[in-house]
């Protein structure tokens, strides 16, 4: 095209020179105009290319920033979950065939009393050793107690104050009012101090009129900084949970897409635990599939975990139990969790230490520290 333009300009200049009988040096004018235009186009092209490269670099930096934000994690140092006999944690986790039941199971009561208060010595006894182990880490301990009401909290507080003294552990004990916000604060402040324990126990008020299967869960968290500096054991990492609004379908689909793009980038999901009705669970999994999430369909292990058919009816607040079961489920590496609260789906990912994502986490810790 440019050569054609040059030829046309040269022919036009030649006609003018012959017609007006002027100096043949005027034939160089088209060449100069053509060269200037070509140079201008070259400079413009280079500027556009540089701008495009700069924009691609900026987009890449933005994506990396959001990916780093979405994949920021805290450390799960330890966990312990107990269920009443004859329930078996492995059977509940793997959803073993033949393990389904509709019965309710309770912890033993002290002195054959039915009230729930007579059951807490049995439960607390199971966590005495876990509380004792915290003394080995030589870190400030904060125990956050999840209880259905103030009376239950005060009973647990008294019991744990006693066993903390016996175990030689200096612990600050407080009620857990908003665990979702608390974990969000821990993730945001990756250098928060000390060890934080979430303890959740649900016992029926009257064993003779039980409403759910009883359970108790112990989750020990620390910051990546504290875990590295104090050489704490790392059982898994908990990736930043997010809240997805359930009231706006368009915003919900967009949020699932962003979660797939950033939080689950380059990751395969091995299991999903949603404390939600089955219809809602299938909907969430479907939206994640549509968003491009990669699923590991290993038929030897369940992809969608629903503990309730194997434990019997669970209490309304069973999400800490879900995290406890996930922590024990080390055979599946990247595990999604989600529960409904206040019109939102609170969703995150627990990553066990034998996964590639865990290696990525260690690299991140080295950079941070």
What name fits each language-model region?
Residues 1-192, 202, 206-213, 217-369:
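Conserved "HGTGT" condensation-loop signature of ketosynthase/thiolase-family condensing enzymes
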Residues 198:
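Active-site-adjacent substructure of cysteine-protease-like catalytic cores
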């Amino acid at each position: 095209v440019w050569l054609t333009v040059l030829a046309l300009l040269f022919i036009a200049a030649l006609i003018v020179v012959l017609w007006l009988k002027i100096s043949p040096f005027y034939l160089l004018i088209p060449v100069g105009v053509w060269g200037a235009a070509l140079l201008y186009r070259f400079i413009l092209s280079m500027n556009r290319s540089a701008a495009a490269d700069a924009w691609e670099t900026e987009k890449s930096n933005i994506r990396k920033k959001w990916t780093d934000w979405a994949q920021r994690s805290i450390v799960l140092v330890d966990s312990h979950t107990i269920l009443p006999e004859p329930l078996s944690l492995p059977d509940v986790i793997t959803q073993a065939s033949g393990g389904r039941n509709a019965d309710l199971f309770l912890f033993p009561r002290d002195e054959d009393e039915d009230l729930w208060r007579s059951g807490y010595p049995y439960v607390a006894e199971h966590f005495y050793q876990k509380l004792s182990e915290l003394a080995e880490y030589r870190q400030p301990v904060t125990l956050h107690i999840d209880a259905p009401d103030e009376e239950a909290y005060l009973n647990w507080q008294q019991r744990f104050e006693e066993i903390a003294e016996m175990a030689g552990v200096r612990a600050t004990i407080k009620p857990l009012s908003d665990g979702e916000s608390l974990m969000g604060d821990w993730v945001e402040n990756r250098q928060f101090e000390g060890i934080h324990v979430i303890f959740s126990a649900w016992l029926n008020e009257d064993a003779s009129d039980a409403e759910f299967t009883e359970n108790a869960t112990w989750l020990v968290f620390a910051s990546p900084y504290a875990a590295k500096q104090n050489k704490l054991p790392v059982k898994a990492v908990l990736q930043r949970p997010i809240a997805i609004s359930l009231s706006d379908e368009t915003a919900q689909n967009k949020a699932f897409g962003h979660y797939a793009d950033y939080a689950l980038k380059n990751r395969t999901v091995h299991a999903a635990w949603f404390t939600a009705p089955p219809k809602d669970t299938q909907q969430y999994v479907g939206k994640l599939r549509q968003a491009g999430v990669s699923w590991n369909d290993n038929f030897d292990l369940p992809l969608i975990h629903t503990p309730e058919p194997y434990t019997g009816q669970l209490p309304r607040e069973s999400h800490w139990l879900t995290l406890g079961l996930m922590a024990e489920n080390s055979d599946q590496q990247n595990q999604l969790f989600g529960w409904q609260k206040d019109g939102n789906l609170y969703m995150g990912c627990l990553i066990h230490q034998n996964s590639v994502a865990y290696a990525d986490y260690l690299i991140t810790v080295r950079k941070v520290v």
